[in-house]
């Protein structure tokens, strides 16, 4: 706001008379509207200029002191702006609180109005916690998260609010947390209890922001902490289902509820040394005389009995509230002592680190509607805290190493690392994400575009951590990592240092199930799908990785065998098989002219079609060439399906049109075949995927269209994906197939009456794969892939055995993901699964793992 005109007087001068002729002109805004239009943007950006902060507080407070109470429009606009900042940009709360304290000294009625407004907001939010039809929008963080933020703001106002009233709110929230915690047995956590306990403790240091020397406040806070410590029993619940890594975790998971008390106590210890190094000192801006205010009415906490049904936080109350449904853990990417003998992010085991994580998550979640603002705010968070917490923005790791060696007393914490780590934590959150992946991915792209030199290396270090831990990473998270990596690369010219991974490719390129090889293959294929200019991807690869440029779902030899399997006594040159083309219309086939007539028929308008014409064409082919086509039913289905797909290959909507138009004819022809429905459906799916062999993502999406037209079932799609082909199971490793499986199950889960038998089928099919793999390995011991040095030369037998172990881990990891992701559906099947587990799974270590997951499902 520095340098702006500071006058907010829009009233015309007394006695001014204008005798000029009147001309038509744009209507002037009312003075109060113009005032708001000029002043509120300055409030929204308060603190963004450190140099202008003191001047901003002075002029804004003067304007509010003079204007508040004169017009309802101004009052409402100001309070709404305050509320938006407090909930959406909590790092600006101290600035708004300071503004309020200064205003209170010059206009106590205005100060009282602000306090009452937020106290009433607090009461309203508490009332909303027991409302069944609570309305949730995409940026709704939840009533309990908003209670946290509203109480934090009121805590900042401790100099102007009667302390007993303020600390009484804390006491009552702690009592509620304790009561909820005691409502369940010693081994069962209460999600809401943990949220209230953690959030309330996290707010306590804000009571001292402007009020560090108040002895009464210190005594009251000591009593509060003593009560929480003595009465709240922290319950340790370890859910392996929601762990990001299946084994060899790169860091020890830390739950927020386990560390918040010690973090707060340490922050208040040693005469609040940590807080003095964290919070900026605004004492010189505080007014000399302060008038204290009281709340209008006692706070009403919802009755325990009414609140208990909502305490699982599983009723869709908001994005941040829902994060407490399962134990809230700290996600770590930039681990200490990796790049040097220091850390680049503030440890979560400090109050400072925990608070920064909390604020960044709140900004990302509550400002979801304004991605550009989020991208700007999360990397400038350091401006609102004490200088020196973070190192200079954009400092490279090499520069940081030099600085640390020369001046070890300087901070090594990077605000970029902290922001990116928290956003990645939201992307990799299990069991569910809080926003669409598109929002998180594009947010990261924008942050990088705003400052590529500073952010690109931060991304690179995250890429490397995830890649190095692919062997251990959760199955579903591998897919999220793949998506994020591919989107980042496609937005930055597909640039990556592929040479870093070359040794892995040299060592394991012959493996089918090695996690790093499957990742590289899927990544390159995904990049090819994301660009219309193939050379962009090709040119970015080193020679070692160009072997993975073939994006085919199955090999050319397998595809040729598929087409040749339709004929006996007739063969063709495999070279005639072309991508995205209808093979059977090629002139090498004696019936190609009839195929062209079938295509002509498909292109006719629905009212012009007569199925007898189509049947006649098929009969002509059978009469003339049936002796060379042993299974004419299979051939007919494949020909018609591929002809449809070929006709609609310009776009998915185009394909949908042709499928819809041809549905009646297809049903008529299929019904006349004396073949089991599931066999015909496999023919349909295989025909589509083989046609789109060069782009199986398109193939699976078009298969979905056949499903929506009720020509194939969800179970048939899953059967196809999870069936071995020549001893290999693409459904475990190919990204497009895995995406199809998750998409199919998710669509089923969203239906009001989902078909549980399909979920049962997928589980049982994966068990079959596991049992078969264990049998081939011939072991009763626990199966864990050894850490294999990529410099080691493996013979054929060693690699084959390793591949079986990786296959086993892929299938077990897949089961872990579907049990977690579709826990509601699988919870119905738990008794059945448990009863038959010993017979269904001979391998005891696998059986124990599944039994553990069955028990954990009840916690999700």
Curated annotation (Swiss-Prot):
Domain of life where this protein originates: Eukaryota
A Gene Ontology molecular function term of the record: mRNA binding
One Pfam family cited in the UniProt record for this chain: MIF4G
Ranges for domain MIF4G: 36-271
GO biological process: 7-methylguanosine mRNA capping; mRNA 3'-end processing; mRNA export from nucleus; mRNA splicing, via spliceosome; mRNA transcription by RNA polymerase II; nuclear-transcribed mRNA catabolic process, nonsense-mediated decay; response to osmotic stress; rRNA processing
Keyword tRNA-binding: no
Alphabetical keyword list: mRNA capping, mRNA processing, mRNA splicing, mRNA transport, Nucleus, Ribosome biogenesis, RNA-binding, rRNA processing, Transport
Record localization: Nucleus
Gene3D superfamilies, per database record: 1.25.40.180
Cellular component, GO annotation: commitment complex; nuclear cap binding complex; nucleus
Function: Component of the cap-binding complex (CBC) involved in the nuclear export of capped U snRNAs. The CBC complex is required for efficient pre-mRNA splicing through efficient commitment complex and spliceosome formation; and involved in rRNA processing at sites A0, A1 and A2.
Family label: Belongs to the NCBP1 family.
Subunit structure, interactors included: Component of the nuclear cap-binding complex (CBC).
Name assigned to this protein: Nuclear cap-binding protein complex subunit 1
The species this protein was found in: Eremothecium gossypii (strain ATCC 10895 / CBS 109.51 / FGSC 9923 / NRRL Y-1056) (Yeast)
């Amino acid at each position: 706001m520095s340098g702006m005109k500071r006058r907010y007087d829009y009233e015309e001068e007394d006695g001014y008379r204008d005798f000029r002729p009147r001309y038509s002109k744009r209507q002037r805004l009312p003075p109060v509207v113009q005032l708001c239009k000029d002043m509120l943007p300055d409030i929204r950006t308060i603190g963004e200029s450190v140099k202008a902060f003191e001047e901003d507080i002075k002029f804004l407070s003067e304007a509010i002191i003079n204007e508040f109470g004169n017009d309802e429009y101004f009052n409402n606009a100001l309070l709404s702006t305050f509320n938006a900042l407090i909930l959406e940009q909590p790092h600006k709360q101290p600035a708004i609180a300071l503004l309020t304290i200064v205003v209170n000294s010059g206009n106590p009625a205005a100060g009282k109005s602000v306090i009452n407004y937020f106290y009433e907001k607090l009461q309203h939010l508490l009332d909303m916690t027991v409302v069944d039809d609570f309305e949730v929008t995409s940026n709704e963080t939840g009533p309990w998260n908003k209670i946290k933020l509203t109480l934090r703001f009121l805590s900042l106002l401790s100099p102007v609010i009667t302390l007993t009233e303020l600390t009484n709110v804390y006491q009552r929230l702690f009592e509620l947390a304790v009561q909820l915690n005691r409502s369940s047995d010693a081994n069962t956590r209460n999600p809401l209890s943990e949220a209230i306990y953690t959030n309330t403790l996290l707010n306590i240091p804000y009571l001292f922001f402007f009020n560090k020397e108040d002895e009464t406040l210190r005594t009251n806070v000591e009593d509060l902490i003593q009560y929480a410590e003595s009465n709240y029993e922290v319950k340790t619940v370890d859910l392996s289902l929601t762990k990001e890594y299946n084994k060899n975790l790169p860091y020890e998971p830390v739950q927020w509820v386990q560390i918040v008390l010690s973090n707060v106590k340490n922050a208040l210890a040693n005469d609040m040394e940590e807080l003095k190094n964290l919070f900026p000192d605004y004492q010189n801006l505080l007014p000399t005389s302060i008038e204290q205010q009281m709340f209008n009415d006692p706070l009403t906490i919802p009755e325990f009995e009414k609140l208990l049904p909502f305490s699982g936080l599983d009723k869709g109350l908001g994005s941040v509230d829902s994060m407490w449904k399962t134990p809230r853990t700290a996600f770590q990417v930039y681990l200490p002592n990796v790049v040097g003998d220091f850390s680049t992010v503030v440890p979560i085991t400090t109050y400072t680190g925990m608070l920064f994580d909390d604020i960044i998550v709140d900004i990302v979640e509550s400002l979801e509607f304004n991605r550009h603002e989020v991208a700007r705010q999360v990397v400038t968070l350091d401006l609102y805290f004490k200088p020196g917490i973070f190192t200079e923005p954009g400092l490279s790791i090499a520069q940081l190493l030099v600085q640390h060696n020369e001046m070890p007393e300087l901070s090594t914490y990077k605000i970029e690392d902290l922001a990116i780590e928290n956003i990645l934590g939201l992307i990799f959150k299990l069991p569910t994400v809080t926003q669409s992946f598109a929002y998180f991915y594009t947010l990261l792209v924008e942050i990088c575009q705003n400052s590529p030199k500073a952010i690109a290396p931060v991304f690179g270090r995250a890429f490397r951590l995830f890649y190095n831990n692919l062997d251990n990473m959760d199955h579903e998270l591998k897919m999220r990592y793949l998506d994020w990596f591919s989107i980042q690369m496609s937005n930055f010219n597909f640039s990556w240092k592929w040479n870093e991974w070359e040794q892995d490719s040299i060592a394991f390129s012959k493996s089918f199930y090695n996690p790093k090889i499957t990742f590289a293959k899927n990544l390159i294929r995904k990049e090819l799908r994301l660009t219309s200019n193939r050379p962009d991807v090709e040119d970015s690869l080193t020679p070692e990785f160009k072997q993975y440029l073939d994006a085919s779902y199955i090999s050319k030899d397998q595809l040729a065998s598929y087409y040749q399997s339709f004929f006996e006594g007739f063969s063709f040159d495999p070279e005639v098989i072309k991508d995205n083309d209808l093979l059977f219309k090629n002139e090498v086939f004696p019936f190609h002219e009839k195929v062209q007539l079938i295509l002509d028929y498909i292109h006719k308008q629905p009212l012009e079609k007569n199925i007898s014409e189509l049947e006649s064409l098929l009969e002509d082919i059978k009469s003339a060439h049936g002796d060379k086509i042993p299974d004419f039913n299979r051939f007919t289905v494949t020909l018609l399906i591929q002809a449809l797909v070929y006709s609609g290959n310009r776009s998915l909507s185009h394909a949908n049109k042709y499928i819809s138009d041809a549905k009646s004819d297809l049903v008529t022809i299929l019904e006349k075949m004396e073949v089991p429905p599931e066999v015909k459906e496999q023919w349909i799916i295989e025909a589509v995927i083989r046609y789109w062999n060069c782009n199986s993502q398109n193939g699976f999406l078009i298969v979905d269209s056949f499903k929506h037209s009720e020509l194939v079932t969800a179970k048939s799609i899953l059967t196809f994906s999870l069936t071995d082909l020549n001893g290999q199971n693409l459904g475990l490793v190919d990204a497009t197939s895995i995406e199809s499986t998750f998409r199919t199950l998710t669509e089923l889960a969203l239906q009001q009456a989902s078909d549980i038998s399909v979920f049962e089928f997928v589980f049982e099919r994966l068990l079959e794969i596991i049992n078969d793999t264990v049998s081939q390995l011939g072991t009763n011991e626990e199966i864990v892939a050894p850490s294999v040095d990529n410099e080691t030369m493996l013979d054929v037998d060693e690699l084959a055995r390793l591949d079986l172990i990786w296959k086993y881990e892929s299938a077990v990891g897949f089961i872990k993901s579907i049990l977690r992701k579709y826990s509601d559906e699988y919870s119905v099947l738990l008794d059945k699964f448990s009863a038959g587990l010993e017979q269904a799974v001979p391998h005891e270590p696998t059986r124990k793992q599944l039994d553990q997951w069955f028990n954990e499902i009840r916690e999700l």
